Regions:
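Glycine-rich loop(s) and the adjacent beta-strand/alpha-helix scaffold that form part
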Residues: 160-195
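Conserved structured core elements
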Residues: 40, 83, 155-156, 179-183
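Conserved N-terminal/central alpha/beta ligand/cofactor-binding core
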Residues: 1-122, 127-147, 164, 168-171
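Glycine-rich phosphate/diphosphate-binding loops that line cofactor/substrate pockets in enzymes
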Residues: 95-98, 155-159
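Short, mixed charged/polar active-site loops
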Residues: 135, 150-155
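Residues at the start of alpha-helices and the adjacent loop-to-helix junctions
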Residues: 31-34, 150, 177, 181
Length: 195
């Protein structure tokens, strides 16, 4: 696997057609256009974070052809592009002083409240799923009231909540996605009327 990128401007029309065709022409044309036009800046950002995409002997990116693509336009790292990207992104996030990472924690619901006459998300309900360690200290779990035991829900309050929910590939019998990608956040959003 890898990431589709517009290797040169002259490839735009073919890239657009390949993407529309792969999506059975049900894709939002505007979204496809944005994806293609922003692809190079996304790759440049990842390169700046240290992602090690494969390169040709002259140092330029090496592209491969996959799936519905009619030309080589996939930036990749061996056969573990996703791992390479997530490893480098996690390293970058761990350097941020204003970010707390809660590992082995899953969101089970959201907290809502009123702000300026509107219902807003004020945090999440989560559960520790770390089976190797039955108790996680409260200070590691964003102001939980006491020690949190595996399977016990706890609340995380926030002024602003951003959902980076992943995909839904894990709900299908045949998928190359991680089985943990079950779309739980999509369900929770639907239950709360979030669009």
């Amino acid at each position: 696997g890898g990431i589709c990128v517009l290797p040169q401007g002259s490839d735009y029309d073919a890239f657009f057609e390949d993407t529309m065709h792969a999506g059975h022409y049900e894709n939002r044309r505007e979204s496809v256009d944005i994806m293609i036009r922003s692809s190079r800046s996304v790759i440049n950002d990842l390169l700046a974070m240290g992602v090690d995409f494969e390169r040709k002997t002259d140092g330029s990116l090496d592209f491969t052809r996959e799936g519905a693509h009619s030309r080589p336009r996939i930036a990749f790292h061996a056969d573990i592009t996703g791992k390479e990207i997530t490893t480098k992104l996690l390293q970058a996030v761990r350097k941020l002083d204003n970010v707390q990472i809660l590992e082995h924690v899953a969101m089970t619901d959201i907290l809502t409240g009123e702000r300026d006459g509107a219902t807003v998300c004020t945090g999440v309900v989560a559960v520790s799923v770390d089976e190797d360690n039955s108790v996680r200290p409260a200070d590691e779990l964003a102001n939980a009231a006491e020690d949190v035991h595996v399977g016990e829900p706890f609340k995380i309050h926030a002024r602003h909540t951003l959902w980076a929910t992943g995909g839904i590939g894990g709900v299908y019998d045949h998928s190359t996605n991680y089985p943990q990608l079950t779309g739980d956040a999509c369900y929770i959003a639907q239950e709360h009327g979030i669009k």
